[in-house]
Curated annotation (Swiss-Prot):
Reactions catalysed, as given in the entry: Mo-molybdopterin + L-cysteine + AH2 = thio-Mo-molybdopterin + L-alanine + A + H2O
Start and end residues of each MOSC domain: 611-769
The UniProt record lists the keyword Cell division: no
Species of provenance: Drosophila grimshawi (Hawaiian fruit fly)
Record's keyword terms, sorted: Molybdenum cofactor biosynthesis, Phosphoprotein, Pyridoxal phosphate, Transferase
Protein name: Molybdenum cofactor sulfurase
Record bears the keyword Nucleotide-binding: no
Enzyme class, broadest EC rank: transferase
GO BP annotations listed: Mo-molybdopterin cofactor biosynthetic process; molybdopterin cofactor metabolic process
Length: 770
C-alpha cells in the first residue's frame, strides 16, 4: 500500500499485537515522547520482584551483580564493551547532560558549542559550563565538518591545553532528522570549520586552538535506531531508557568513552562514591572505578534491574538485529504518512498540511520515524495545533503538539526571529507546554506523530482519516460543533483551549460620518439601528445631496474620534493637528436647530444641521463650497419595515471575512485591503466566501439574521488610507465571483430576550446556526 513495506512477518505482527491488545480502541502516536511497554514485559518484571530479594546494592552483592549485568547489556546493545566505555546510571538523558556540563574541564580557554535544534536540556547546560565562550551552531554549520578531510583545519589533532565541547542530537526530536554520525570523528580530529554564533562570550580574544570533544544526545535516536559505538565513538552519549523500552521510567545513562573520562573532573561526592571522607578535615578519596565516582547515593536499583526485561522483550518480539528492524519499520511508516499527507488537498488544490523536515523521507539514514506538520485551511491559513490536539483526543488518537522541548527547531521551522520569539514568550505570555498555538496567524509550534515497533499501518491510516473527515469533508463550524458537544471528554488542559477555537470577532468599526474614515473600537453598544454612533452624520453639498467617496475620495482622510462627549473630526491629509468637534448628545439647542432633508439610496432622510463651524472646517479641508454636516433626526426603516436603519445604505451591519479578502491576493498589506470594504464586523473563518452561505449567526450573545450579499461598486477601489484609486479591486472580485460584484454580507440583529443593552466586543466567538 503506497510505499509502505511491512518489516514483520504475520506471526511476528500477531505476537506484537497480542502484547499491546490494550490499544484496541485507541491510537498511540507519540513514541518520540515515550514508547510503550509490552504486557509480558511488566508481568515478568513484577514476577521477578515477587520472586527475588532485591535490596540496596550496598547491602547485597546479588543486587550489585544484577546492576553489573545490566551495564554489560547496555554496552552490548550499543555494540561496545567495558574496555571502550563506562556506563554511569542517571535519572534520564537530561541528568546525563547535566553531569557532563557540571564536570567537563574546559581548561582556561575552551569553548562550548551546541546545535540550535536541540532539546531544552542542552540549552540548560549553558548555565553550568565553565567555558569562556558559548556558541550556537546551525545544523548546516555542523554538516560543514562532514566534508572536511582529516587534519584539514587549524585545530588538527595535536594535543592542546584547552578543551572544547560540541553537543548535538543524533536525531532531532522535532523533525526526526538524523545527523550523520560520521561528523563525530571529523570534529574530534579537526575541530569545527565554523564555530557558530557567539551567544555568551566572556572573552573577546581569539579562542585559539583546542581539543574537541563530542557529546551526543541519543535519547531520540536510540529509541528506534541502532547506535554502533564501535563505528562511531562520541566521547559522551546521553540516554533515557523509557524511550527505548517504555518501562521503567526514572533511569537513564551517560556512556563515557575512555577519552572522555579524562575530562570529567568530579567535585561533589555522595554516598558510595568515595573510599573515605573525613568529617574533621577536607581530606577524601574518590573511588577508583569510574562509574562509582559519578553515581552519587543509592542507585534506582529496582528500575535498573527491570531493564533486563526490556532487553529481553525487544529480542523476543523483534528477533534478529532488533533495532535495525525497528528502524526500517518506523521509517517505512513515516514515509507512508508523509506521502499520504502530501496528497491531501482541498477542492481548490490547496494543500492540507505543511511538513517540517530537512531531508525528506527517502533515506532511512537521514530521517527517523517522526512526522511534524501543521494543518492549513483552504485559504492557506494555519490551524492552531490546539485544535488538532482537541480533534485527535476526541478520536482517541494520542499525539504531541507544541515545540516538544526543542525551541530551537521550532524557531528554525516556524521561521521565528528574535522579535517574534519575544512576542510569543514575553509579550503574549506563552510558556512551554501550553496551547498558545497562533500569533497573528503564525504557528508557534507544530503537530508531531512518531512511531514505534508496535505501531501498525492502520494506526497511521486512522490519523489520516481523522484529518480527511475533520478538515477536507466538513466546514469549520461543523467541526467546532463536534468539539463543543464533546468538550467534557477532553483532558482538562484542552477543555479551555477547545472553548476558544471558534472564530472570533476580529475587528469592530463604526463610521460616525457617512463615507468618512472608520473608527475602530474594542467594543461597542448596540442600538435599535445598529452600532452606536455608526453613520449618524453625513456631509451634504449645496444641493442637499449626500457627499460620498465616489465624488470626493478625500472623505476617507477625515478621521473621527470620540473624546468624552464630543465627536472630533481630524483631517489626515495635510499633517495638521487642527480638528473640529460636535456634541454627541442631542441637546435642546441641537434639536431646535435647522432641519434638513437629504437622500440615502433613494430614501428621504431628515437631519439636524450641525452648524457653521464644522461646515466651514469641512469646506476648508475638502476644498469644496457649501458643505454642511447633518445628523440623522428620525427613524429610518429598511424596505419591508423590518429593521431600523441609520444612514447606512442597506442594512444595519456589514460583515466581511478576512479569508475572502485574503483570497484576492493583493500585494498591499491585508489590513489595507480589509479597510477598502468598510465593514462594521470582520471575522476570519479560514474559508473564502463561506459567509455567503450563512443564514443566521451568533456573535457573542447576540443573534443576527443574514440579509444577503453586499453588491459592490467602485468605491472599494479606493485605498482608505491614501484616497488613491486602484480599479483592479473590482475586476478581481468580478473574476472570482463569476461576474458578480458581491463581497461581504449584510446582517441585522434579531430580537433578544435579554433586556440588558447588548454590545459587541472584539474576541466575541462566532457561531453559525444555519
Amino acid at each position: 500500500m503506497g510505499d509502505y513495506t511491512a518489516e514483520f512477518t504475520p506471526d511476528e505482527q500477531a505476537l506484537i499485537d497480542a502484547e499491546f491488545a490494550r490499544l484496541s480502541d485507541s491510537t498511540y502516536l507519540d513514541h518520540a515522547g515515550t514508547t510503550l511497554y509490552a504486557h509480558n514485559q511488566v508481568s515478568d518484571a513484577a514476577q521477578q520482584l515477587q520472586r527475588d530479594v532485591i535490596c540496596n546494592p550496598h547491602t547485597c552483592r546479588v543486587t550489585g551483580d544484577y546492576v553489573d549485568q545490566v551495564r554489560y547489556k547496555i554496552l552490548e546493545f550499543f555494540n561496545t564493551n567495558a574496555d571502550e566505555y563506562h556506563v554511569v546510571f542517571t535519572a534520564n538523558a537530561s541528568a546525563a547532560l547535566r553531569l557532563v556540563a557540571d564536570h567537563f574541564d574546559f581548561g582556561t580557554n575552551g569553548n562550548f558549542h551546541y546545535c540550535q535544534e536541540n532539546h531544552t536540556s542542552v540549552l540548560g547546560m549553558r548555565q553550568l559550563v565553565s567555558a569562556n565562550r558559548i556558541y550556537m551552531l546551525t545544523k548546516d554549520q555542523i554538516l560543514l565538518n562532514n566534508g572536511t578531510p582529516a587534519g584539514a583545519t587549524a585545530a588538527a589533532a595535536t594535543a592542546h591545553s584547552d578543551n572544547s565541547l560540541v553537543v548535538f542530537s543524533a536525531q532531532c526530536n522535532f523533525s526526526g532528522y538524523k545527523m550523520p554520525l560520521t561528523v563525530i570523528e571529523k570534529i574530534q580530529q579537526d575541530g569545527l570549520r565554523e564555530p557558530g554564533k557567539c551567544i555568551d562570550c566572556k572573552l573577546q580574544s581569539d579562542p585559539g586552538q583546542s581539543n574537541y570533544y563530542v557529546c551526543l544526545d541519543a535519547a531520540s535516536y536510540a529509541a528506534s535506531s541502532p547506535l554502533d559505538l564501535r563505528r562511531h565513538r562520541p566521547d559522551y552519549v546521553c540516554l533515557s531508557f523509557y524511550k527505548i523500552f517504555g518501562y521503567p521510567t526514572g533511569v537513564g545513562a551517560l556512556l563515557v568513552s575512555k577519552r572522555g573520562a579524562e575530562l570529567l573532573k568530579k567535585r561533589f561526592y555522595g554516598g558510595g562514591t568515595v573510599n573515605f571522607a573525613y568529617p574533621h578535615t577536607m581530606e577524601h578519596q574518590l573511588r577508583s572505578t569510574f562509574h562509582e565516582r559519578f553515581e552519587d547515593g543509592t542507585l534506582p536499583f529496582l528500575s535498573i534491574v527491570e531493564l533486563l526485561q526490556g532487553f529481553q522483550t525487544l529480542q523476543r518480539l523483534v528477533p534478529g538485529r532488533s533495532m535495525e528492524r525497528i528502524s526500517r519499520h518506523v521509517h517505512s511508516l513515516a514515509r507512508y504518512c508523509e506521502q499520504q499527507l502530501l496528497q491531501m488537498q482541498y477542492p481548490n488544490g490547496a494543500p492540507l498540511v505543511t511538513l517540517y523536515n530537512h531531508a525528506g523521507y527517502e533515506d532511512r539514514m537521514q530521517q527517523g520515524g517522526i512526522v511534524a506538520f501543521n494543518v492549513r485551511t483552504a485559504a492557506g491559513d494555519y490551524v492552531g495545533f490546539g485544535e488538532i490536539a482537541s480533534v485527535a483526543a476526541l478520536h482517541r488518537i494520542l499525539l504531541r503538539t507544541g515545540c516538544f522541548c526543542n525551541v530551537g527547531a521550532c524557531q528554525h521551522f516556524m521561521n521565528l526571529n528574535g522579535d517574534a520569539m519575544d512576542a510569543i514568550y514575553k509579550l503574549a505570555g506563552r510558556i512551554c507546554g501550553d496551547y498558545y498555538d497562533l500569533l497573528d496567524g503564525r504557528p508557534t509550534g507544530a503537530v508531531r506523530v512518531s512511531f514505534g515497533y508496535m505501531t501498525r499501518l492502520q494506526d497511521v491510516d486512522r490519523l489520516l482519516q481523522m484529518l480527511r473527515d475533520s478538515y477536507l469533508s466538513v466546514k469549520w463550524h461543523q467541526r467546532l460543533d463536534f468539539i463543543e458537544q464533546r468538550v467534557q471528554q477532553l483532558p482538562k488542559l484542552l477543555q479551555q483551549r477547545a472553548q476558544q477555537l471558534r472564530p472570533q470577532l476580529l475587528q469592530l468599526a463604526i463610521y460616525p460620518v457617512k463615507s468618512c474614515a472608520a473608527l475602530k473600537m474594542p467594543a461597542s453598544a448596540l442600538t435599535d439601528q445598529g452600532l452606536q454612533y455608526d453613520r449618524e452624520w453625513m456631509i451634504v453639498d449645496l444641493n442637499g445631496m449626500a457627499l460620498t467617496q465616489k465624488r470626493c475620495t478625500d472623505l476617507c482622510l477625515i478621521q473621527p474620534r470620540i473624546v468624552a462627549d464630543q465627536l472630533q473630526l481630524h483631517f489626515n491629509g495635510d499633517g495638521s493637528t487642527t480638528f473640529v468637534s460636535v456634541p454627541l448628545s442631542l441637546t435642546d439647542q441641537a434639536t431646535n436647530s435647522a432641519r434638513c432633508q437629504s437622500k440615502v439610496c433613494r430614501q428621504s432622510v431628515e437631519g439636524y444641521d450641525c452648524g457653521d463651524e464644522v461646515a466651514n472646517w469641512l469646506c476648508q479641508q475638502l476644498g469644496l463650497d457649501g458643505l454642511r454636516l447633518l445628523r440623522q433626526s428620525a427613524q429610518r426603516r429598511a424596505p419591508g419595515d423590518r429593521q431600523q436603519l441609520s444612514l447606512v445604505n442597506q442594512a444595519q451591519f456589514l460583515l466581511v471575512n478576512r479569508a475572502s479578502v485574503r483570497s484576492l491576493g493583493f500585494e498591499e498589506p491585508l489590513d489595507e485591503t480589509v479597510d477598502r470594504f468598510r465593514s462594521n464586523i470582520v471575522i476570519d473563518t479560514g474559508v473564502p466566501f463561506e459567509e455567503l452561505e450563512f443564514g443566521q449567526l451568533r456573535i457573542g450573545e447576540v443573534l443576527f439574521q443574514v440579509e444577503g450579499p453586499c453588491q459592490r461598486c467602485d468605491m472599494i477601489c479606493i485605498n482608505q488610507r491614501t484616497g488613491q484609486r486602484s480599479p483592479d479591486t473590482l475586476t478581481t472580485i468580478a473574476r472570482i465571483q463569476s461576474g458578480k460584484m458581491r463581497f461581504g454580507i449584510y446582517i441585522s440583529r434579531l430580537p433578544n430576550e435579554n433586556r440588558m443593552q447588548p454590545q459587541l466586543a472584539c474576541g466575541d466567538p462566532i457561531t453559525v446556526l444555519r
